[in-house]
Amino acid sequence: MRVKIIVPSLGESITEATIAKWYKKQGDSVKTDELLLEIETEKVTLEVNAPCNGTIGKISKTEGANVAVGEEIGEINEGASANTAGTNNESAKAQAVTQPTSEKPAVANNTLAPSVQKLVTENKLDPNNIKGTGRDGRITKGDVLATINTTTTSAPAISKSNEERVQRVRMSRLRKTIAQRLKDSQNTAAILTTFNEIDMSKVIALRNQYKEEFEKKHAVKLGFMSFFVKATIEALKLIPSVNAEIDGDDLVYKNYYDIGVAVGTEQGLVVPVVRDADKMGFAEVEKTIGILAKQAREGKLSMADLSGGTFSISNGGVYGSLLSTPIINPPQSGILGLHKTEERAVVIDGKIEIRPMMYIALSYDHRIIDGKEGVSFLVKIKQLIENPEKLLLNL
């Protein structure tokens, strides 16, 4: 019986994808749930597994092809591998007697995921020398990065005098989507950015005082992001328009707080969402952000992790950014930009003191948020971070 291989549901509002990599070819035997191919959507890369045992009877859509949800991309002849197993057994045994066994199976380039193959090629690595830790011994991106880290210190410098000076690389669907959405945001929203600065002295002191006890009790490190998430929620409650969006001729005010946290990955920027962050404690916020960030870097985020979000936070400070104007993530109406904390001279009670200061920025849609509201939003965050006890006491 022939069983169709179809493009699965890709999540909310996603109707099209690109075939990134086939791991099987026509005639190959497959088992139920064995990896067949990877499909790249505008947000994540998804695996498509075999629905039954059999052999690949047809591949109708090749790598690089755009496909729609529910579209047939191939078929499996169910049970075909089982019918031929008996006849193949004897020849397999004969080959086992006459052919020497390799200590380490070769890894063909066509078994590597596109992102992994790219790393291997760019760093001139032999995949046969990389131990795979993924499913069925597959080489993961982490395996390649670990190999790079262990070899870079001893590897001789490579002259690039004879290499091509220009490399043309096809944009991934994720990169195309990032480019399109950011440009759409600029073309649609009336984006305005307002700035403020925060004295980080008290929140740094509070973190230093309790970070070891916090980690021991909650099994997660106490960072600054949880303070900013909680402060942001209080500011959103004070200024509801920042948590709203425009839908046609209507303004939609949201009475829940799903906070998107921007994460930079090798494939591009993604914004996983911390759901109902207002109902979480500091430890749960830190754990959730840590899990989502790890999944983002490993390419394991689901569509649900990336969908929705009422407001976003982007922390360019981790890369050393001192000041920036973040771009709104549509259909949201605002995004908070955090930056590098550095010691600066400030006037405190008429005296010059050295304090750890951070610039913060709010980019917002001026169609729905007035200037007064934007400034008040940042002032509220400033007040809470400079007096973190108010966050803890819900003041």
UniProtKB/Swiss-Prot annotation:
Details of cofactor binding: Binds 1 lipoyl cofactor covalently.
GO process annotations (BP): L-lysine catabolic process to acetyl-CoA via saccharopine; tricarboxylic acid cycle
Catalytic activity: N(6)-[(R)-dihydrolipoyl]-L-lysyl-[protein] + succinyl-CoA = N(6)-[(R)-S(8)-succinyldihydrolipoyl]-L-lysyl-[protein] + CoA
A single cellular component GO annotation: cytosol
Location of the Peripheral subunit-binding (PSBD) domain: 111-148
Pathway assigned in UniProt: Amino-acid degradation; L-lysine degradation via saccharopine pathway; glutaryl-CoA from L-lysine: step 6/6
Keyword Nuclease: no
UniProt entry tagged with the keyword Methyltransferase: no
Cofactor(s) demanded: (R)-lipoate
Enzyme class: transferase
SS bond partners: none
Residues with N6-lipoyllysine modification: 43
Superkingdom, taxonomy of origin: Bacteria
An example molecular function term from Gene Ontology annotations: dihydrolipoyllysine-residue succinyltransferase activity
Active site (UniProt): 366, 370
Sequence ranges assigned to domain Lipoyl-binding in this UniProt record: 2-77
PROSITE patterns, per database record: BIOTINYL_LIPOYL, LIPOYL, PSBD
EC number(s) on file: 2.3.1.61
Keywords: Acyltransferase, Lipoyl, Transferase, Tricarboxylic acid cycle
CDD domains: lipoyl_domain
Subunit structure of this chain's protein: Forms a 24-polypeptide structural core with octahedral symmetry. Part of the 2-oxoglutarate dehydrogenase (OGDH) complex composed of E1 (2-oxoglutarate dehydrogenase), E2 (dihydrolipoamide succinyltransferase) and E3 (dihydrolipoamide dehydrogenase); the complex contains multiple copies of the three enzymatic components (E1, E2 and E3).
UniProt-listed PANTHER family: DIHYDROLIPOYLLYSINE-RESIDUE SUCCINYLTRANSFERASE COMPONENT OF 2-OXOGLUTARATE DEHYDROGENASE COMPLEX, MITOCHONDRIAL, DIHYDROLIPOYLLYSINE-RESIDUE SUCCINYLTRANSFERASE COMPONENT OF 2-OXOGLUTARATE DEHYDROGENASE COMPLEX, MITOCHONDRIAL-RELATED
Family to which the UniProt record says this protein belongs: Belongs to the 2-oxoacid dehydrogenase family.
Functional note: E2 component of the 2-oxoglutarate dehydrogenase (OGDH) complex which catalyzes the second step in the conversion of 2-oxoglutarate to succinyl-CoA and CO(2).
Designated name of the protein: Dihydrolipoyllysine-residue succinyltransferase component of 2-oxoglutarate dehydrogenase complex
Organism classification: Bacteria, Pseudomonadati, Pseudomonadota, Alphaproteobacteria, Rickettsiales
